C-alpha cells in the first residue's frame, strides 16, 4: 500500500475550497516575495534539512519534529511528551530588523506561535520568557480563541488584536509576512495578503501594551532587540506545519 502523507490527510480531513479572491491574494503575496531580488532574501528553511535550526535548550529535533513534503511538522508529541519536554524550534542565528515570510498550517484545535527577540540561555526555560509572539491558532476549535481577539491567529499575543479574521481553516496553509523594525518603531502582520495587525516596537506605547498584558511583571520580556526566531511547541498533542520560510534583514 502506498504511504499517504500526513499533510495529505490533514488537507483531505480539514480542507475546503477557498474563495478565489482570497486564494489569489495569497498567491500574489508569495509571488511578490519570490520576485524580489534573490540577494535580499535568505532561505531559513528549504524543506529538505534542519540546517539553520535546532530545538531550544538542545533537545533532539527528531523526537518531536519530522520533515515531510517540504514542511517541518511537529507531529511526534505523544512519544516526546513522556518526559514532559517541549520542543520549540529556534534559529541558529540572531536577527534584529527583518521581514519574515512563512507559511503555517494547524490541525483542529492546535496552538503555536512565532516569536522573535528570543534569548536562548539556560536561565530561561522557555522562549516566551523573552520573546513576544505572533499567535498561530485554530480560531474555531482551540479554547484560547474564546479568551479575546488578542489570543487569536495573527494577534500580537495578549497585546494587539488583528483588525479582521482572514485565517484559513484547520488543514489549510496560511501565509504570514511579519515585519519587525526597531529602527522605525514598526511591527506588522500580513495574513494571507491582508494587513491585519500593527504595533510599535519600543517606547512608551510598547511599554503601555506590556503593562496591560499578562507579561507586565516579566522583567526580560520584549527587552532584547536582537534575538532568535522561535516556532513554538505549545505543549499539546497537536500537529503544526511550517514551510517556505524566508527572511529579509532590514
Language-model regions: role of each:
Residues 17-250:
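Carbohydrate-interacting regions of secretory-pathway proteins
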Amino acid at each position: 500500500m502506498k504511504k499517504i502523507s500526513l499533510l495529505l490527510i490533514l488537507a483531505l480531513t480539514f480542507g475546503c475550497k477557498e474563495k478565489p479572491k482570497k486564494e489569489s491574494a495569497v498567491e500574489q503575496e508569495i509571488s511578490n516575495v519570490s520576485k524580489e531580488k534573490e540577494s535580499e532574501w535568505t532561505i531559513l528553511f528549504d524543506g529538505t534539512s534542519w540546517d539553520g535550526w535546532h530545538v531550544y535548550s538542545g533537545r533532539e529535533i527528531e523526537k518531536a519534529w519530522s520533515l515531510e513534503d517540504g514542511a517541518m511538522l511537529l507531529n511526534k508529541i505523544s512519544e516526546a511528551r513522556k518526559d514532559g519536554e517541549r520542543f520549540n524550534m529556534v534559529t541558529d542565528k540572531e536577527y534584529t530588523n527583518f521581514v519574515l515570510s512563512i507559511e503555517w498550517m494547524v490541525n483542529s484545535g492546535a496552538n503555536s506561535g512565532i516569536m522573535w527577540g528570543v534569548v536562548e540561555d539556560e536561565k530561561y526555560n522557555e522562549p516566551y520568557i523573552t520573546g513576544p509572539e505572533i499567535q498561530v491558532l485554530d480560531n474555531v476549535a482551540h479554547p484560547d480563541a474564546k479568551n479575546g481577539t488578542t489570543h487569536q491567529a495573527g494577534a500580537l499575543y495578549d497585546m494587539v488584536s488583528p483588525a479582521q479574521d482572514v485565517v484559513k481553516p484547520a488543514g489549510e496553509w496560511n501565509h504570514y509576512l511579519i515585519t519587525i523594525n526597531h529602527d522605525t518603531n514598526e511591527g506588522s502582520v500580513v495574513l494571507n495578503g491582508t494587513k491585519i495587525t500593527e504595533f510599535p516596537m519600543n517606547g512608551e506605547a510598547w511599554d503601555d501594551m506590556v503593562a496591560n498584558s499578562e507579561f507586565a511583571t516579566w522583567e526580560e520580556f520584549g527587552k532584547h532587540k536582537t534575538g532568535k526566531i522561535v516556532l513554538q511547541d505549545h505543549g499539546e498533542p497537536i500537529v503544526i506545519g511550517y514551510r517556505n520560510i524566508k527572511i529579509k534583514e532590514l
